[in-house]
Amino acid sequence: MGRSLKKGPFADASLLKKVEAQADSDKKTVIKTWSRRSTIFPSFIGYTFAVYDGRKHVPVYVQEDMVGHKLGEFVPTRTFRGHAADDKKTGRK
């Protein structure tokens, strides 16, 4: 279920402050964040965010088609190692 339209999109105030500061300074450094729940705004396009996945910060370069999605959608938190293989040599199931 999506967020109500009357509430509008959400982004952490500290994250918006960091993006504004980068826009003013004309430097493109990586913005470190723990806010996976923040919605990507059009003003974020072209910036690289280091989004925390529970272990480390993973860099995410924001492009135009990412607007409206959450930062956490682009950084998986779980590692899938695959299913166990069947034992076909013995013929057992």
UniProtKB/Swiss-Prot annotation:
Q: Which GO terms describe its biological process?
A: ribosomal small subunit assembly; translation
Tell me the leader sequence span. Answer: none
Pfam families given in the database record: Ribosomal_S19
Q: Which domain of life is it from?
A: Bacteria
Supply the alphabetized keyword list. Answer: Ribonucleoprotein, Ribosomal protein, RNA-binding, rRNA-binding
Q: Ubl conjugation: is it a keyword of this entry?
A: no
GO molecular function per UniProt: rRNA binding; structural constituent of ribosome
Record InterPro entries: Ribosomal_uS19, Ribosomal_uS19_bac-type, Ribosomal_uS19_CS, Ribosomal_uS19_SF
Q: Name one GO cellular component term.
A: cytoplasm
Q: Which family does it belong to?
A: Belongs to the universal ribosomal protein uS19 family.
Q: What does this protein do?
A: Protein S19 forms a complex with S13 that binds strongly to the 16S ribosomal RNA.
Q: Which NCBIfam families did the record assign?
A: rpsS_bact (TIGR01050)
Name it.
Small ribosomal subunit protein uS19
Origin organism is Limosilactobacillus fermentum (strain NBRC 3956 / LMG 18251)
